[in-house]
């Protein structure tokens, strides 16, 4: 499970790295080595447009803002194997996919591997270039009309050396698949 991640590149760097076409962001987010659930994050959606969302997908049936916010920390990750079935995630998976730019992510060792439990690891590319993590997003509206954009990271079974640390890992999206992923039609 990816419960924390880092984004050490700003909006301009993301714009360039992802060949973005438009910008929906009206303010810059600070660089952050410790992005936690419910923090505001950058997402790339639609025709490669930069937007912000709160990390943790708000379930569509939430009726008030307090319940919506409380539900977010339980929906930061969506399993790739069941995303199309789970009520919290299935609509967003069918209609609202995104990429989540990151520099790296943190994983805490479990008893699966050769490392002591709860030993943190920072996982990134050797060349420190951006990671593009597959995600989903949604737009939730309260009874009073407040709109909150939220997003979740898609995870899969860990492979290779990562499987010695934890059983899950984010789904990384190859550059050649970005447009196909962002257009679920």
Can you name each region flagged by the protein language model?
Residues 1-185:
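Short linear sequence motif anchored by a di-proline
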């Amino acid at each position: 499970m990816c419960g924390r991640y880092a984004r050490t590149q700003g909006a301009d760097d993301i714009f360039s790295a992802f060949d973005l076409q438009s910008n929906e962001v009206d303010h810059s987010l600070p660089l952050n080595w410790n992005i936690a659930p419910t923090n505001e994050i950058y997402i790339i959606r639609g025709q490669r447009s930069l937007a912000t969302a709160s990390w943790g997908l708000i379930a569509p049936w939430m009726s008030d803002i307090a319940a919506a916010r409380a539900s977010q920390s339980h929906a930061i990750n969506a399993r790739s194997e069941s995303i199309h079935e789970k009520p919290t995630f299935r609509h967003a998976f069918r209609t609202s996919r995104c990429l989540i730019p990151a520099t790296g992510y943190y994983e805490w060792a479990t008893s699966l591997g050769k490392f002591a439990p709860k030993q943190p690891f920072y996982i990134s590319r050797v060349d420190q270039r951006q990671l593009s993590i597959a995600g989903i997003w949604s737009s939730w509206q309260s009874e009073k009309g407040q709109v909150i954009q939220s997003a979740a990271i898609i995870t899969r079974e860990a492979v290779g050396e990562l499987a010695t640390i934890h059983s899950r890992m984010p789904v990384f999206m190859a550059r050649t698949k970005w447009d196909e992923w962002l257009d679920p039609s």
